[in-house]
Amino acid sequence: MSKGPAVGIDLGTTYSCVGVFQHGKVEIIANDQGNRTTPSYVAFTDTERLIGDAAKNQVAMNPTNTVFDAKRLIGRRFDDAVVQSDMKHWPFMVVNDAGRPKVQVEYKGEAKSFYPEEVSSMVLTKMKEIAEAYLGKTVTNAVVTVPAYFNDSQRQATKDAGTIAGLNVLRIINEPTAAAIAYGLDKKVGAERNVLIFDLGGGTFDVSILTIEDGIFEVKSTAGDTHLGGEDFDNRMVNHFIAEFKRNDKKDISENKRAVRRLRTACERAKRTLSSSTQASIEIDSLYEGIDFYTSITRARFEELNADLFRGTLDPVEKALRDAKLDKSQIHDIVLVGGSTRIPKIQKLLQDFFNGKELNKSINPDEAVAYGAAVQAAILSGDKSENVQDLLLLDVTPLSLGIETAGGVMTVLIKRNTTIPTKQTQTFTTYSDNQPGVLIQVYEGERAMTKDNNLLGKFELTGIPPAPRGVPQIEVTFDIDANGILNVSAVDKSTGKENKITITNDKGRLSKEDIERMVQEAEKYKAEDEKQRDKVSSKNSLESYAFNMKATVEDEKLQGKINDEDKQKILDKCNEIISWLDKNQTAEKEEFEHQQKELEKVCNPIITKLYQSAGGMPGGMPGGFPGGGAPPSGGASSGPTIEEVD
């Protein structure tokens, strides 16, 4: 295949989306199910691996081996409080591998464990394939988005996931920044505008304030809640109905995973309905112990169940305004991103907060991020279209970065919301006489003391010549590149001795070897998936050939054209094959093909004889036998082929 353009991928917590900039505009690409967003789900079964819709659709039958929310694990340590609290809610198992979380599943009858990067890489591979199927070209270059909140290690791990998926990640950009680009292209204005981006997705909530002037974006502030989104609203509804079921039927379904999962799917559907209708009905047959569950919910009740969560979305809005040092009257535009911003109550709360100001909903909220990422991908890969030419992107660091100085004080070198790439240098000295070395501990966070902030990594600079305290000069440099990856170095001015760290190590970064290995494994899994597809198609081919052949010889139009002995011979062989198939559903492709050849050996001579004696097609059937497809041509192409539906 020829090389395709660069794409933009919104790798979401619950759903992902891919877009491409071509012919002067962005196209959001639908997957094979016709959906423009794809669930960030990967499932493992006894026979195959499923990604996307196919994985999400079977989650009720296979909850412990269906992995989602990898984005909540990526770039985190196992003992991270977030990981520990999230684990309680996941049906799949998360295990501790040398301090790093891995998800453990059963695949083809064996226990397998995967790093979050590997799971995310599977979703990215799916998005890459969706783009390739649409473009008819191979896709390697991509811009991938992350929440503004992501720290360094989460960004790096996301980039690694891209590498494992066989992508060249041109840049990692913030989701709100991407949405701003999508927006900036649509509305070119001369004067400076302050834009607030309100992004409420399936699992995360981000508020960002940007200024846009003459095609230049600057991010002024970011705030949000990494744990608020559509799923939380679903949960409130689920709990409401569990309680209702308890009241009416005196049964507690909460311990039954499958029942809860079916209820949740129905609730998600009802929630979507409530964005356009004032009430929705829920009908689930035999939800629990044979009891049907038929009920309904009004929009008002849904809003009441989520009242605190909905209202709570305004707190980060206020915080972002404070950080940007802006009053709400100074915001020119409010942009809605994320499917949950379709909820009328949320739109109303936001509109009232901004004193009745109109909200921008012109961009499909599910697609805005991928849209902007696609534009950015075009810019970075040198698209010369005037639509993207004069767009420049300035991203920021989400948290302040600094080092610990005497007494556990956080000394900030790079303030939060500093535009990146950036480089800051500051000179430090020793704290005691003849001190031989210094420990440089790098932290991120806004608190005055390092113990309240997050340790990113540390290293020692040793070999400082003996000197009284305060004499040695140690120059510390913080350097953040365009992807938000941080390098910290320290140099002793007297000796020129240097040591440095790329902040990633202590967060459980994957090593080069790990990534190489995972790339190979990803290839292997992909090959296995292909093999599985081939196997299924040769099985289907054999099955349809046997059934069609049976139907053909039993057709009354052939009565008298075929002698009973031949007919019986074919029927016996077909029945033998059909019963073999029932017992050998999981046989290898070669076995299915062998069985088909055996069957053809019996059938072909008889069918050929039939033609010759009939002098052409029997019963005026120029197109072949009824139900028999075209005359068998041997191999996997015999019998009508049915397109697989994943």
UniProtKB/Swiss-Prot annotation:
The modification Phosphoserine is found at residues 153, 329, 362, 541. Acetylated. ISGylated. Pfam families: HSP70. The modification N6,N6,N6-trimethyllysine is found at residue 561. GO terms for biological process: clathrin coat disassembly; mRNA processing; negative regulation of DNA-templated transcription; protein targeting to lysosome involved in chaperone-mediated autophagy; RNA splicing. It catalyses: ATP + H2O = ADP + phosphate + H(+). ADP binds at residues 14-15, 202, 268, 271, 275, 339. There is a cross-link at residue 512 (Glycyl lysine isopeptide (Lys-Gly) (interchain with G-Cter in SUMO1)). It is an enzyme of class 3 (hydrolase). GO terms for cellular component: lysosomal membrane; melanosome; nucleolus; nucleus; plasma membrane; Prp19 complex; ribonucleoprotein complex; spliceosomal complex. Residues 394-509 are annotated as: Substrate-binding domain (SBD). The modification Omega-N-methylarginine is found at residue 469. Gene3D superfamilies: 1.20.1270.10, 3.30.30.30, 3.30.420.40, Actin, Chain A, domain 4, Substrate Binding Domain Of DNAk, Chain A, domain 1. Induction: Constitutively synthesized. Molecular chaperone implicated in a wide variety of cellular processes, including protection of the proteome from stress, folding and transport of newly synthesized polypeptides, chaperone-mediated autophagy, activation of proteolysis of misfolded proteins, formation and dissociation of protein complexes, and antigen presentation. Plays a pivotal role in the protein quality control system, ensuring the correct folding of proteins, the re-folding of misfolded proteins and controlling the targeting of proteins for subsequent degradation. Component of the chaperone-assisted selective autophagy (CASA) complex consisting of BAG3, HSPA8/HSC70, HSPB8 and STUB1/CHIP. Identified in a IGF2BP1-dependent mRNP granule complex containing untranslated mRNAs. Interacts with PACRG. Interacts with HSPH1/HSP105. Interacts with IRAK1BP1 and BAG1. Interacts with DNAJC7. Interacts with DNAJB12 (via J domain). Interacts with DNAJB14 (via J domain). Interacts (via C-terminus) with the E3 ligase STUB1 forming a 210 kDa complex of one STUB1 and two HSPA8 molecules. Belongs to the heat shock protein 70 family. This is Heat shock cognate 71 kDa protein. The lineage of its organism: Eukaryota, Metazoa, Chordata, Craniata, Vertebrata.
